[in-house]
A protein has these predicted regions:
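Aromatic- and glycine-enriched glycan-recognition loops and surfaces
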Residues: 262-362, 391-395, 435-445
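Bacterial N-terminal signal peptides that target proteins for export
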Residues: 2-13
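Active-site-adjacent "subsite" loops/lids of carbohydrate-active enzymes
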Residues: 320-322, 326-327, 334-404, 478-498
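Bacterial N-terminal signal peptides
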Residues: 12-20
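Polysaccharide-binding and catalytic clefts of secreted carbohydrate-active enzymes
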Residues: 147-157, 171-172, 280-283, 293, ...
Length: 686
């Protein structure tokens, strides 16, 4: 039987039927919709309930509406029923509108709902567009993954946006997203190796709270869409954006006043007290006349990644700190400082004053804690959304900072990391998912209410929090430094600039002019035997690549650990000139790069170059750091933009120290030319 969509168009090949998984003898299984199959699984503490284990399946239809009902399970009982509802769409896809289970007689909790699980065809060349970092195209070696194993899983933390896709050249690609109020819940997206050769499974996953009521009966509290389509990562991001921008929370976020952030030409991510952090800001503004935003780390009276959340007072004293803020602002700078809104040092003596009552706990009672600082060896425990003691400390801190004259604060780890299920028995919320997101949203809103007009930012974009933060830092223009892999297997793509454009400002990179990581004097004596200058000089292209890549993506430029020592270093003369030129180019082209719309990537031909990158960090000596290699990096980066008045242009940058030629095909308009070393070019389409 063929089904008609409500519009009257035939839903492409929408033949719905029950069938058994290849190689299995189950009496019930998935639902076929066209060329894909739709099923579910429910993960419990001990095992997984799968649709293939159910005793019967009935499928009913009404116009474009499909209802699948599975009944009976060997463990959950004969009365166990799972019902899924889908609405077929003209393109051959469907909206998953409802999923519910009931009648579970077994004493097992449902810890994860996975629906829909959409089995689609693939080839060995199929790539995955996944919502990690800024967006990523991952080209797996499918031979390395066993049937039913995750090939790629995104979330619950670091879920940059709510869609995923399987990409095919010359055949249909496959898109899956989360809609409705998914952002308020503990969710993930995954791609699994398929049940038969030549298949993969797109999965939406949800971790519900664990209660007696939800053990017996529960379901998905949101909807989403599966769609076959023609195209790649850009079309997938655009599809999700087309829904997101219709939501009231997106419209409210986009209506905010971003004018103060729009005036920024470059960010400086500084680490140190007043004597380290203030002079470079004045130097750059004097040299260029451009506005600098200082993202100030290590202003606090405690060692970094240690003794959180007791940041106050500043290490230069309250008066010295406030005087420095005033001097920078009087000369036109934007100033914000680092705070951590989500972690408490569980090895600090003050942990006993409320840490356990505030913390996220994993199943079994362990803290969700990590040691970042290898010198102090203190662990930071992640904090739940139900944490009045911790939140009270942070709220007072942010008030102190606003009263110090700052433009805003950065609240680390919330947007990227406040998504975990929590099982702390001291908390009033049900164990499991959803409590952390709801608690953190209320907490961040309270900070906003306490500090009207204060600009808040956090780490990474997420649909859960983007409407509460005006800005987000993303460091993945420094892809290799962050250890994210090499082309062609792992390719960063600027999907965030498609999904969030106009509703949240994105800034950031790890581009470090001198190349050396910073050292906090409060950690103690710096380790000996690290010949930094001799090592970092071996990576001459890294700074320009990292700085320019983000600008091309529409991310506000940032330099990391830029000090007056860099100004005096003759090795860096060309890099610092490129830094000035890049900030000026970004500022002069904000009608495209800040206000405009990122278009589908054009085709550009240019030479490639082998480039080595040093993956150094504060917690690893330079000589012990890893070198990442891009064997064939394009020497000209590019992106295409449409301004609000309809003008279209390509942004081009030659990050190398040699002149580079290029050929550009911009939607049928062909351009060619050359770009001098370390320079930018705006190529108008018409």
């Amino acid at each position: 039987m063929k089904f008609k969509a409500k519009s009257g168009h035939a839903a492409t090949a929408a033949i719905v039927a029950a069938f058994a998984l290849c190689g299995h003898a189950q009496s019930a299984s998935d639902v076929r919709i066209g060329d894909v199959r739709v099923g579910f699984s429910l993960a419990t503490g001990a095992d997984t309930v799968r649709c293939s284990q159910m005793k019967s399946l009935a499928v009913t239809t009404n116009g474009n509406a499909v209802t699948a009902t599975w009944r009976g399970h060997p463990v959950c009982g004969d009365g166990f029923t799972v019902t899924a509802k889908m609405a077929l769409m003209p393109d051959g896809g469907f909206e998953y509108t409802s999923f519910r289970y009931e009648g579970n007689d077994a004493q097992i909790d449902v810890r994860r709902i996975s629906f829909p699980e959409v089995t689609v065809p693939r080839t060995d060349a199929t790539a995955i567009f996944r919502p990690n970092t800024v967006g990523e195209v991952f080209r797996p070696d499918w031979r390395k993954f066993r049937r039913g194993k995750d090939v790629s899983a995104s979330g619950v933390n670091w879920l940059t946006f709510g869609c995923i896709a399987a990409l095919n050249d010359g055949a249909a690609s496959h898109f899956l997203d989360q809609r409705g109020e998914a952002r308020l819940h503990t969710v993930a997206l995954a791609v699994v190796q398929g049940p038969e050769p030549g298949t993969l499974v797109l999965c939406n996953r949800y971790a519900p709270p664990l209660t007696d009521a939800l053990r017996r009966a529960g379901g998905l509290p949101y909807t989403g869409v599966y769609a076959p389509y023609t195209g790649g990562w850009y079309e997938a991001a655009k599809m999700h954006r087309s829904w997101l921008e219709t939501t009231p929370w997106f419209k409210k976020a986009a209506a905010r006043d971003f004018s103060k952030l729009r005036e920024i030409a470059i960010w400086m991510w500084s680490r140190g007290g007043v004597e380290v952090s203030e002079p470079p800001v004045h130097w750059f503004m004097k040299e260029t006349g451009l506005k600098v935003a200082l993202d100030w780390y290590w202003w606090h009276g405690i060692p970094y990644d240690t003794s959180f959340p007791y940041f106050w007072p500043p290490r230069d004293g309250v008066d010295g700190f406030r005087a420095a803020v005033k001097r920078m602002k009087d000369r036109g700078a934007f100033v914000q400082v680092y705070t951590n809104g989500a972690s408490w040092d569980c090895d600090d003596p003050r942990w006993e004053e409320g840490g356990m009552e505030s913390a996220i706990m994993l199943p079994g009672g362990k803290l969700f804690a990590k040691m970042y600082n290898v010198f102090t060896r203190h662990r930071l425990a992640r904090i739940c959304g139900e944490a009045p003691k911790f939140q009270g400390i942070i709220r007072q801190l942010e008030r102190n900072l606003r009263e110090s004259g700052l433009d805003g604060v950065y609240m680390d780890q919330i947007s990227c990391g406040a998504h975990n299920p929590c099982y702390n028995p001291r908390h009033k919320h049900a164990p499991g998912g959803d409590a952390v997101e709801k608690g953190y949203r209320a907490y961040v809103q309270s900070v906003r209410d306490d500090n009207p007009g204060f600009i808040l930012s956090s780490e990474a974009t997420s649909e859960t929090y983007f409407d509460l933060f005006e800005a987000a830092i993303l460091l993945y223009s420094s892809w290799e430094r962050c250890g994210k892999g090499s082309l062609p297997q792992s390719e960063p793509v600027p999907a965030v600039s498609v999904v969030y454009r106009g509703a949240e400002v994105i800034f950031g990179s790890f581009a470090t002019p001198g190349g050396a990581p910073a050292w906090d004097p409060m950690w103690g004596k710096k380790p000996d035997g690290d010949e930094v200058e001799a090592v970092v000089a071996k990576y001459p292209d890294q700074f320009a690549v990292e700085l320019s890549r983000g600008i091309v993506w529409g991310i506000q430029p940032m330099v990391h650990n830029f000090t007056m020592k860099d100004v005096a270093n003759p090795r860096l003369v060309k890099d610092l000139q490129f830094m000035k030129d890049s900030a000026r180019f970004y500022f002069e082209n904000r009608d495209f790069l800040f206000d405009g719309e990122l278009l589908k990537p054009a085709t550009l031909k240019c030479a490639t170059k082998r480039v080595e990158f040093l993956s150094a960090s504060c917690y690893k000596r330079v000589k012990d750091s890893t070198t990442y290699v891009q064997k064939a990096l394009p020497t000209v980066f590019h992106s295409e933009w449409r301004a609000k008045d309809g003008r279209e242009a390509a942004v081009l940058v030659n990050w190398t120290r040699e002149e580079q030629k290029y050929e550009l095909d911009f939607e049928g308009v062909r351009k060619s030319g050359s770009i001098p070393p370390l320079s930018w070019k705006l190529e108008r389409r018409f």
